[in-house]
Regions:
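Alpha-helix C-capping/helix-to-loop hinge sites
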Residues: 5-8, 28, 72, 76
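A beta-strand edge to alpha-helix "cap/lid" segment located at domain peripheries
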Residues: 43-120
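A solvent-exposed, acidic/Ser-Thr-rich amphipathic alpha-helical stretch
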Residues: 14-19, 23-65
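Hydrophobic alpha-helical context, especially transmembrane and signal-peptide helices
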Residues: 2-3, 29, 84
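Short, aromatic-enriched amphipathic alpha-helices that serve as compact interaction elements
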Residues: 1-13, 20
Length: 120
């Protein structure tokens, strides 16, 4: 189900994503303290979100069970680059709930440089 969610997101036809969302779907963004209620609101928000080009989604990892899953996805429109960590709840073949985190990259503190290697 999560693979299909991201496949549909990659079409940039965000109303098509409604096919895998429950009508009472809820998405929570704890970092900005926002909640989106309903598959239609999810589609409209993504349709109206300003972008510099089509959104491209690169799946880094998906794991879980038929009822719960987690994905780590790189998202870009060619200018904006982000990483989404999404926690999915699935029931009756539909995504019913998501909690999504959009972590911001930051520079590592200098004082631990001798213990780590850079990821590029």
């Amino acid at each position: 189900m999560v693979q299909e969610f991201w496949r549909l997101m990659a079409t940039n036809d965000f109303h098509a994503v409604e096919a895998v969302l429950a009508q009472d779907f809820i998405l929570e963004w704890p970092q900005s303290k926002e909640r989106i209620r309903g598959a239609t609101n999810f589609a409209l928000l993504n349709t109206e979100y300003p972008a510099h080009g089509p959104w491209v989604f690169t799946i880094n990892r998906i794991f879980g069970s038929e009822n719960e899953a987690v994905s780590d996805v790189f998202v870009t429109d060619g200018v904006q680059n982000a990483r989404a960590i999404s926690l999915f709840t699935i029931a009756h073949g539909k995504v019913t709930h998501m909690v999504e985190f959009w972590p911001e990259p930051y520079e590592a503190p200098f004082d631990r440089a001798r213990f780590v290697e850079r990821i590029e």
